[in-house]
Amino acid sequence: MSGKINILMLGGAKRVSLAKIFKSAGERMGKGVEIFSYEIIPSVPIACVGTVLDGSRWGDADIYDKIAKVIKEKEINIILPFVDGAIEICSKLKELHPDVFIPVSDFAVAHSMFDKVEAAAVFESHHFEIP
């Protein structure tokens, strides 16, 4: 990784504080941190600390191609999901872009955990108590 770290955030709230923390940590490490956020609405608070990119809905057929283009054009090093729907997207992106750090589980686990009934069945099969 060079002297610059580019982070792509996918959806969600409360990202401004985290973006500021990432930038501060980058400064301490002697690296510039640039924040990008993939949005369907351009006027979001993250715009005060990063660049808002025109995004697609999670269910759009071409979302992987569009994010792949962002990864290449913006030289993205890290992708972080901030909403449940983005976790499954990120698990697929992790398979498609192994050079990008994407801290999510594999698609099967992400998919199971997104569905509460399916998640409960997985927990029960491993003898976890479910409240």
Go through the PLM ranges and name each one.
Residues 1-106:
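ATP-binding N-terminal substructure of ATP-dependent carboxylate-amine bond-forming enzymes
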Residues 96-131:
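A conserved helix-loop-beta module that forms one wall/lid of the active-site cleft
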